């Protein structure tokens, strides 16, 4: 395609002049997605979805396959980067009121659910000790569903316990779901460009827009370069920083790890699950911790879109961010006091942010009227 046509293609995307660095994470997510699909394909070529050979095949990839160690580490750490970017992307959407583009927000939340499912299936594939037990604990939550639970669990496992059929179907799902993510990402981007992205002020930016290229492309490239540098530094110097020590041992159904936990990016949801001493209640809280994002566009009552001029909401937002980190931290700790109490308080505060959002908006409107 000639240079002028490329310019015209990007020039057709007018964007607000005042969008900040927080708007760069969408393109970074696209880059992460591309990296995951490419490295995932080369890993799938050498991987064996069999409970007796899965762990050995990962060892084979790292030791014997040319640049296999690089592919495996890029894929594993790339997943962590993906989640760091998506959590910042969601936080920016909550802070600046991007959720008022309802279709874009709802498609994005669906993308998050698909991404979490894909990452969970991927975590099981190495068939290490923590992979096996995390899969056992999480899939067992289906049994909490009245009437259908046991049947659904047996169907998902492919038997009466996690075994070879479970690993095979998890591999199949881990392979196929990214294609759904790519399709939904395309829809997400199309829906975004229907109305155009918001800006930090939360105002209509139609009167003050600039072409996407060259301004935003270079801005995006800077952040992409920084992310790539960080990724390569971690891959080169700290490749096992996000790994669980238990996962370096092959899965053993007869030995339970002292403390079962999923990957770090699920710990906030796992912490909420553990904070409720009831199986069904915990499973519902776990589901609601993600699903509650779907309610945000419909509970916005403030006349201001962005939190930039809403000091009370800013305080609540940063309390929410701190709560997210606290739940993540408590989920890494044993189920004993004071961690159980801390996680219960933090879980309550997590949900209180979404509940008090409309009340705070209504109060702000009252204050502005007086």
Curated annotation (Swiss-Prot):
PROSITE patterns: CYTB_CTER, CYTB_NTER
Cofactor note: Binds 2 heme b groups non-covalently.
Compartment(s): Mitochondrion inner membrane
Pfam families: Cytochrom_B_C, Cytochrome_B
Lineage: superkingdom: Eukaryota
GO molecular function: metal ion binding; ubiquinol-cytochrome-c reductase activity
Required cofactor names: heme b
Alphabetized InterPro entries for the sequence: Cyt_b/b6_C, Cyt_b/b6_C_sf, Cyt_b/b6_N, Cytb/b6-like_sf, Cytochrome_b, Cytochrome_b_C_euk/bac, Cytochrome_b_N_euk/bac, Di-haem_cyt_TM
Record field: transmembrane: 25-45, 69-90, 105-125, 170-190, 218-238, 280-300, 312-332, 339-358
Positions contributing to heme b b562 binding: 75, 174
Record-linked Gene3D superfamilies: Cytochrome Bc1 Complex, Chain C
Topology within the bilayer: Multi-pass membrane protein
Amino acids binding a ubiquinone: 193
Sequence similarity: Belongs to the cytochrome b family.
The protein's role, per its UniProt record: Component of the ubiquinol-cytochrome c reductase complex (complex III or cytochrome b-c1 complex) that is part of the mitochondrial respiratory chain. The b-c1 complex mediates electron transfer from ubiquinol to cytochrome c. Contributes to the generation of a proton gradient across the mitochondrial membrane that is then used for ATP synthesis.
UniProt name for this protein: Cytochrome b
């Amino acid at each position: 395609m000639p240079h002028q046509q490329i310019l015209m293609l990007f020039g057709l995307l007018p964007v607000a002049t005042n969008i900040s660095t927080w708007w760069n994470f969408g393109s970074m997510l696209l880059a992460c997605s591309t990296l995951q699909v490419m490295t995932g394909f080369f890993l799938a070529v050498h991987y064996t979805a069999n409970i007796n050979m899965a762990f050995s095949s990962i060892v084979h990839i790292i030791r014997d396959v040319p640049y296999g160690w690089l592919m495996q580490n890029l894929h594993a750490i790339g997943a962590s980067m993906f989640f760091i970017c998506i959590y910042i992307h969601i936080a920016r959407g909550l802070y600046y009121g991007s959720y008022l583009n309802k279709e874009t927000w709802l498609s994005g939340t669906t993308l998050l659910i698909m991404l979490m499912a894909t990452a969970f299936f991927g975590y099981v594939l190495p068939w290490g000790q923590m992979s096996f037990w995390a899969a056992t604990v999480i899939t067992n939550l289906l049994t909490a569903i009245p009437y259908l639970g046991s049947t659904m669990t047996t169907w998902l496992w492919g038997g009466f316990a996690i075994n070879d059929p479970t690993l095979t179907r998890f591999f199949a799902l881990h392979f196929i779901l990214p294609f759904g993510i790519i399709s939904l990402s395309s829809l997400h981007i199309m829906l975004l460009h229907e109305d155009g992205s918001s800006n930090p002020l939360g105002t209509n930016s139609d009167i003050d827009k600039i072409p996407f290229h060259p301004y935003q492309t270079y801005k995006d490239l800077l952040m992409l370069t920084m992310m790539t540098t960080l990724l390569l530094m971690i891959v080169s110097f700290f490749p096992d920083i996000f790994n669980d020590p238990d996962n370096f041992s092959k899965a053993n159904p007869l030995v339970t790890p002292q403390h079962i936990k999923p990957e770090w990016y699920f710990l906030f949801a796992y912490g909420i699950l553990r904070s409720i001493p009831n199986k069904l209640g915990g499973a519902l809280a776990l589901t609601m911790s993600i699903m509650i994002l779907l309610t945000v566009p419909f509970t916005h009552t403030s006349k201001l879109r962005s939190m930039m001029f809403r000091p009370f909401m800013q305080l609540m937002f940063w309390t929410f961010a701190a709560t997210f980190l606290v739940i993540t931290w408590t989920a890494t700790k044993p189920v004993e006091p004071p961690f159980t109490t801390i996680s219960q308080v933090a879980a309550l505060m997590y949900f209180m942010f979404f509940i008090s959002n409309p009340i705070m908006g209504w109060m702000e409107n009252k204050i502005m009227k007086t």
